């Protein structure tokens, strides 16, 4: 599977980069961006992660199938783009796809765990802020739709998980934030709030205060 091969390479090179950084004498803050493809269609996984889930207990979409002719104009156009009108997707097909997606998410979790393990080994775990984000969600069969490109919650909302020194543990923020906020946030974290601005104006707003409970 090319996705697995690719992500294994990303994890390997990220691990090596961290080991190289630990051997370096440069004391400046670092930014390591490890861009994994998982979870992403095609929904293919390995037996190891598939077996973490009971297939019969995989949940089905909360919003049932909506006939293409009854969908909004954009959803109709997208359905025809992916040729959804040419295929009948059974309940078992849906359950299998969702099962694989969950398994792929667990594989991604394991890859992140590898990087966290290296941070611990090089003594940087306690002073490193770790952020998990994604560029899009996944419809997962909701409304009868799949993949991204949909103006609905499942496709538009992405995770933003943050852990590190000074970050509140176990807090779930209800305010809307954006991926645009990442750069000013990283800037504040790296400069202890000194406000060094790489460009002016800088899109987005720093979330550093929010992460700390301000």
Each PLM stretch: what is its role?
Residues 1-12, 16-28, 33-176, 189-201:
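Active-site-proximal cap/lid insertion segments
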Residues 179, 183:
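Zinc-coordinating Cys/His ligand positions in small cysteine/histidine-rich zinc-finger domains
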Residues 204-214:
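Short, intrinsically disordered, charge-balanced linker/junction segments flanking boundaries
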């Amino acid at each position: 599977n090319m996705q697995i091969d690719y992500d294994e390479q990303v994890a390997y090179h990220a691990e090596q980069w961290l080991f190289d950084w630990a051997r370096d004498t440069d004391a400046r803050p670092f930014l390591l961006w490890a861009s994994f493809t998982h979870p992403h269609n095609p929904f293919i996984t390995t037996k190891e992660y598939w077996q973490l889930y009971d297939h019969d207990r995989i949940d089905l979409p909360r919003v049932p199938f909506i006939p293409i002719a009854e969908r909004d104009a954009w959803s109709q156009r997208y359905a025809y783009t992916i040729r959804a009108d040419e295929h009948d997707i059974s309940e078992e097909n849906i359950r299998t796809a969702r099962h694989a997606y969950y398994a792929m998410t667990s594989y991604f979790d394991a890859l992140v765990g590898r990087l966290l393990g290296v941070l611990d080994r090089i003594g940087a775990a306690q002073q490193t802020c770790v952020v998990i984000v994604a560029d899009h969600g996944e419809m997962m069969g909701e409304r009868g739709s799949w993949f991204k490109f949909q103006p609905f919650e499942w496709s538009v909302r992405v995770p933003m998980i943050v852990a590190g020194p000074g970050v509140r543990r176990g807090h779930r923020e209800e305010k809307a934030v954006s991926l645009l906020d990442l750069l000013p946030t990283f800037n504040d974290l790296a400069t202890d709030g000194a406000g060094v601005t790489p460009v002016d104006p800088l899109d987005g707003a720093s979330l550093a205060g929010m992460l700390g409970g301000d």
